[in-house]
Structures are given as C-alpha cells and as structure tokens.
C-alpha cells in the first residue's frame, strides 16, 4: 500500500494504510467491531470555500513544451511562492496553493506546518488572526480562513512536505485552460480533499523538506501598493522597425493602468495609443502591429493592435503581434500582484542589471536575509548605426542565404528572424537547420528552442551562458548552415478533423468584440472578412478553399 499511487477522486487508500499499520492488525487481534474504535487521521486538507481561482502550482512550472504551445504555468508571483516553501523548509519543487483576490477556507484533518505569503488576506485560524511570512502550526480539526486581499492580488499557502498531486509533463502546476495538472486539472471547488505529501512513503514523488521552518526577516517582506515600477529589457521589436522613437519614449514615460480584463493568461494595460512607422503589417495583416510569427517570451508586452497585454504564465507561446519590451525574470513577480486599477511605470534595464537582480533574489530565497544587487547605468534606447537598439546582431542577405536578425527578448530569450516578413517555406527550413544544429550541440544553458515560420526563439539561462556568449554561438552556427535550396527533410501528411465556424470560435469572436474591440474590418464575422478581402463571391468558397488545400 505504501508504494501505491492513486490520484484524482479521493479514495480510502490512506484509511487502509493506517489500518494495516495498527498493532491489532499486526498481532492478528482484529475483530468485527474493530473499526468502531478506530479513528483515522487523514493527511488531507478539506476545501470548505474555494476562494477565487485557487489552484495548485509549483516552481518553476512545466518547462520544455513551449514549442508545442504548452505554457509553463506555475505561480504568478514566484518570489512569494518560493519564500513560502522556504519558510516551511520545503524543497523548492514542492507544490503549493495560489489564490486570487479572495482566499479559500480550509479545514485541516491532520496536524501541519504552513506559511502564508503574498497578498495579505486577513487570515484567521479558528477565528483568531494570524500573520503572514512565518511558519504556523495548525492542529487537526482547525479551520484556516482567508478573506479578501488587503493589498496585492495573489496569496500563497505552503504546507510542509507539499501537496501530493501527480506530475504531468514534469510539473504539478495547474493549467486550467488545458484542464491538466494540479488537483483534477482545475481550480479548487467546495469539498475538494487536498492530500499532503508524505515523503516517507515509497509512492511519494515529492522530495522531503530540506530545512527546519524559519520566519522571514521583516525587511524582506515585499510592499504591495497600487503604484508599481517594473524593470524591462527593450525588445524584441522597437523603433524604427515597427514603432516610432516617440512611441517608445512615451511608453516609458507613461503610467499604464491595469485593466479589469486580466488573468493568468495576460494582464491588459490601458494607456496611450502608439505611433507606428509602418502603415500595415504587409502579408501578415492590416495593422502595423502584425507580423507573420513571433514566439512570445513570458513577460513580453504584446501589442495586439494598439492595445498592450503582458503575456504571463498561462499565455500563448506563438502569435502574430509585436512586443516592444520584455519584463526581466527577477521583476516578473510584480505582475502577479498587480490588480485592476493599479498603475505601472516601466523602466529600461540592461541584461547585466537583470542578471544581478536575479542573483540577488536567489540569495534572498536561499538565506532568508537581505541581499542587494549593484546598480547599473540605464541602457540607451536610441537607434544605433546598425539599426534598432533591440537588435543584438544582424547578418546581411547573400545570393544563397537570407538576412538574419537577432533580437533581444528579455534576459532569458533571443529571437532570431530570417528574411523579409513573408511566408516562405525556405525560411522555415533554415529555422529547422539552426534548431537541429543547436540541439546537437547540447550547450549548457541553452534550455529550449521554439520555432515559428521564419523565426526561432532560444530560451537560455543567463546564469550559465551569457547573452554575449550565446550570440557568439549563434553567429558561429549561422556561418555553417549554407544554402537550403536543395535541403531534404523527413516529412509526413497528417489528417486532422476541423470544425468550420464552430460555436466556440464564434463565441471567441463575440467576446473579442465585446471586451477588446467593437469595430474592426474582420468584425462581426471573420469568414465574411476573408471572403471580402480575397475577392470571393460566396462565403462557401472560403470553406472549400480551406478544406481542399
């Protein structure tokens, strides 16, 4: 029984484990009335009230599947989450609970040591107020109630040993949109029973605690206000390629308000409309924000038309809109605490500055003591002789090779673009060649490769390989790729079912029209728009073209 794993709907597995562990069972003195006096102590936490969008998450989340569109998920405020695990002494990979604006009410069926971090939700234990940021002993039968967030947006609960939920694609994090991970692949509901891991069991996959519980130094407790300063790196798309320099300057000079239509997929911002250097996106679309493809970095600020959205932990991996800046990894936790109505001022930082901040944050988590990063000069946003300040390097086209542009996409990503902004299979083959060459090298610090049509995103760990060393590697590999005009690669034909104008698609268009943009050339019906711009006489021709391709 100790080696048995059963997940999902609650079972009597632990009940049986406790029965076979009794002296009566071992001595063979069990009789028909034995269970009348047997009181089990289930290692679970019962959900009396689920709170708002409460879910199981772990750090760093579900990495390695960005190329097939699976997001990392994980805690929106990973700083508070990791500190919660550190306070109770857990291994960093232990699963914890995230809740948004309104916390849950939980009944403990076993003794436990817990820690609350993040937004202060006026927590009480059996009606008595308790404090965040320190270990707390909870006895079996007690009720922990979390109210509405006083400051900030998201709170976190860590329990010593972590929550016992199965790993899916290498993570216990909930991706509710995909309906997998966490507890039953969804947010919490009334009467859910959340099992606590027991590392002593052979079936347990959660590592045991690594230290004794320890309170956080008061100087380290973050301040959650309504005005935020967030450090970003310029790029991948800037001036003068896409935006005017005036638009970039205005972006950094403005206070951006957090829109109510924000969640774990993205945080919508309200602010000034940008000015563009292009009239449209060419082949990619009617709006100048359109590009054929862009692999998105977590923390990228994505302009869907004239409207910016911070792409977060459950967001899309690939799209067709430009991103002028990307939030530094050590600053991204702040996005998890902004709430509707808050204001954000972004400020540019360098890759070296971002790395120093990340190292300082890591030291704080490791030691639970203050650690300050050195200061760095503010990087220039002005256009250079080689073009936009977002461009790390560029290689001119030749008779047999396309232009290659290497764009900074935060402190953890480089975006490589080939050729012009057109749909060309030869460019996709070159992306494939580069991806294979990088994979074969297996360079330490190069962690993930995500291809698009004419682009490749490289995710790297700047603590292992610097941006400059990565660029040297990429430029060196580019010189070895050569001409792809005669390249042959293994291929196959995949037949996929597809619904035309499905109700879910029509519903998405309706929501877009209601919440994002009321009037646009492609509204109110996308098929009518495609028919019109392609000069077709009947809308059925759109369907026929699609299915006959």
What are these regions, as identified by a protein language model?
Residues 41-549:
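Conserved "landmark" site that anchors the functional core of diverse proteins
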